[in-house]
Amino acid sequence: MELEPGSGEERNRWQQTSLLSLVAPAQLCDGTAEKAVEATDGAATPSTPSHQPPPPARLLILDTETTGLDPLKHRCIEVGAVLFDVPQRAVLSQISFLLPCQTNEAETVNGIAAAVTRLSQPWPEALAYFQTLVAASDLILAHNAGFDRQWFGHGPLPAIEKPWLCSMEDLRWPPDRNLRANPSVRDLALAYGVPVWAAHRALTDCIYLAQVLERCDDLEGLLCAGLEPRQLYRARLPYEERHRARQAGFRWNDPVPKAWSRRLSAREAAAIGFPVSLEQLSA
């Protein structure tokens, strides 16, 4: 589930899951992980990347709907997925299914009544087919992947061992689309001329994202850039220039207290246009 940034306290809470646990898969698009080196002026200097292997050929675009924020207290009640072929820009298969729950505290957000999830339906068979789609993919792509990923390995959902990529935080959409940093699925779809007819159901958001990818001229380059290893950086700007950090997609107080921070590759950090430094979060 991805909710629009900046549209209320509850929506902001849904996006505050840290993506630091997402490890970019070096074997797909990066032969040797880049290492960020902090220069004396606070800027980062990237090492020279080695030869890059081909980008992933098969993506599983994935989204979830849940009863709350915490996988230890709440449940995933809907999974949507689209198997997407990158070279052909084509949807190969798609699935959506509900998982039964007793109550849904987020019904006002996703519109899924708990009673509907308990209606007779072949969700175990659907879950089994979903696992075949996972097996057929090279990479899992999700909008706000840090949120979606945490539900797998809880309840009936198996853990997913494939690499993950976040279309909200890790992909740098072309400047000519006039998107803000970390765009919502809705804004992303509209920027690519995809009609938006519904929101907050799992398969709907997957379809939006698949149609965006169909329209990407350099999807392979976009994916490879997104898979570059990333680390957490803090913006080193005076208070009166804080707008520069915000415009560059840095977040205030999340996850670094009282600081503007964002996950960047070493190449991005060197080109950001203002001083940044590597940040280590305490356990």
Language model: regions and residue ranges:
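Acidic two-metal-ion nuclease catalytic site recognized across multiple nuclease folds
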Residues: 2-50, 212-283
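Conserved non-catalytic scaffold segment of RNase H-like nuclease domains
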Residues: 11-162, 178, 182-200, 248
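Conserved beta-strand -> loop -> alpha-helix junction used to position metal-binding or nucleic-acid-contacting
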Residues: 160-173
